[in-house]
Amino acid sequence: KNLVSDIKQRDIRMVYFAARGTSDHASIYASYLISTYVGVPTALALPSVVTAYDGKLCLKDALVIGVSQSGKAADVLAVMEKAKQCGALTVAVTNDLQSPMAQFGDYHLYCNAGLEESVAATKTFTSQMYVLAMLAAVWGDNEAMLAKLDEVPGAVEQLLSYIPHDIEKIIQRYRYMENGFVLSRGTSMAIAFETMLKLQETNYVKMKGYAVSD
């Protein structure tokens, strides 16, 4: 709530997300929510604009959110540093309270997911989406969304009680798959891209995420 109060006092006109990989997909999800329910335009940063080209960015009236489960992504931190030089309000979303990004941001949104033991980040992706959805809901004074977010832990617990069995039933069909597509649209595009990435990382198959509208 302190962050949202600061945002409203500053008259933020754009949200600029800096992230890589899985965290980039969580940022896509947040972009849809903030654009839709808050009404503020969003953009995904191209970190190389800062790290490779030292590009000029005008982010004075922007909220710049760096997303990284470890909080140690050097290029994401570089974008946050550039943004702060421009006078932007900076926020870090990480799973490490002592990380460089957590220490640098004007605000830190802690995922509090515990140690991420999977190389292909899983629970930290889910927690990033949850934290960013909470930001969108509070910023947009969306009581209905906040109520739905309160239901998430119970829904996840219920899902985990039966989903492994369902996966066992369908997995045989795809055992020898060499490539595939993950189709979606809207907020679920973040899930499509993340599913694509996870299948590539863990099974070494060629995958592509597409919006069905394309």
Predicted regions and their residues:
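A short, well-structured juxtamembrane/interface segment
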Residues: 1-11, 162-176
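Glycine-rich phosphate-binding loops that contact phosphosugars or nucleotide phosphates
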Residues: 10-154, 185
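A general structural motif
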Residues: 47, 158-166, 207-214
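Residue-level marker of positions within ordered structural domains that often coincide
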Residues: 140, 161, 204
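Flexible, glycine/charged-enriched surface loops at secondary-structure junctions
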Residues: 144-149, 165-171, 209-210
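Acidic catalytic cores of enzymes that act on phosphate-bearing nucleotides/polynucleotides
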Residues: 175-214
